[in-house]
A protein has these predicted regions:
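Domain-level signal for soluble alpha/beta catalytic cores
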Residues: 1-265
């Protein structure tokens, strides 16, 4: 049996195994790992927001063998994700994060229409579950207008690598009924944050949206904490911020800016 191809995860040094799909592939929910992990954390008194890769990115990054293409599996994806929505809701989950980093890629008009149709159907099945769609590694210039029209409860945007993110909000606005998860602390590098730049950005955003402070992407790209770096001098450490320190930076920013923060991050 030939191994799956391995590709870089967007512009990072992480790699992923490329899914291979043929005309006989069945796309369905298998197992209950995400739900059971949520329950385990809840039992320990830890409130979590489960996170899963979204169907648009999953199917866009796959390799296809046969006549069928991504759009031919959308209905099966809607069924599988809807089942997950139900199970998480029954377990007491309030928020689910769906990562759709493929939205920062160059998208054709056909792909944009497919994305919109996919989520119009999928979000009609969410019930009381709140859905955050999270993007990262760039801006969503090709699909921003469609994205803000969809009935997501929260939208996560990258202000670090997303060069057009701020311009998009200024040009097209941001819905008052949604929460903006603003990725203003770099989640990929190991350097300290520019507080003044972040504060200036947040002051401008505060008038157009409810804002949650966020990192630009997952913190899996950086080391855990500087506390373990005992061989570094304090002078050197002053330039660095690892995962724990970046969370502290978010807390510092929260204390420093007068905007409404409806949901702790």
């Amino acid at each position: 049996m030939t191994a799956l191809a391995m590709k870089k995860w967007f512009n990072t040094n992480y790699h992923y195994m490329v899914p291979e799909i043929d005309d006989e592939t069945n796309l369905e929910l298998v197992g209950h790992t995400l739900v059971e992990t949520f329950k385990e954390a809840a039992a320990a008194g830890v409130k979590t927001r489960p996170t899963i890769l979204g169907p648009f990115t999953l199917l866009k990054l796959a390799t296809y063998h046969g006549e069928k293409q991504a759009e031919d599996f959308y209905q099966a994806a809607i069924s599988a994700y809807s089942q997950l929505f139900t199970e998480l809701s029954e377990a007491g989950c309030e928020w689910l994060q769906i990562d759709e980093p493929a939205l920062v890629l160059d998208l054709s008009q056909k792909e944009i229409q497919q994305f919109e149709a996919l989520y119009q159907s999928l979000l009609s099945e969410k019930g009381t579950l709140k859905i955050l769609v999270q993007t990262y590694f760039g801006d969503v210039r090709d699909v921003y207008q469609e994205l803000i029209r969809l009935p997501f409860d929260g939208i996560g945007l990258d202000f670090v690598e997303g060069r057009k993110t701020r311009d998009l909000i200024e040009q097209y606005g941001f819905p008052k009924d949604k929460i903006l998860f603003a990725g203003i602390v770099n989640g990929k590098n190991i350097w300290i944050n520019d507080y003044q730049q972040s504060l200036n950005l947040l002051e401008n955003l505060g008038s157009v949206a409810e804002v949650v402070l966020n990192t630009s992407c997952s913190l899996l790209h950086v080391p855990f904490t500087l506390t373990n770096e005992t061989s570094l001098t304090s002078e050197v450490k002053d330039y660095f911020a690892f995962a724990v320190e970046k969370l502290a930076e978010l807390n510092d920013l929260k204390k420093s800016v007068k905007i409404k923060l409806p949901h702790k991050q």
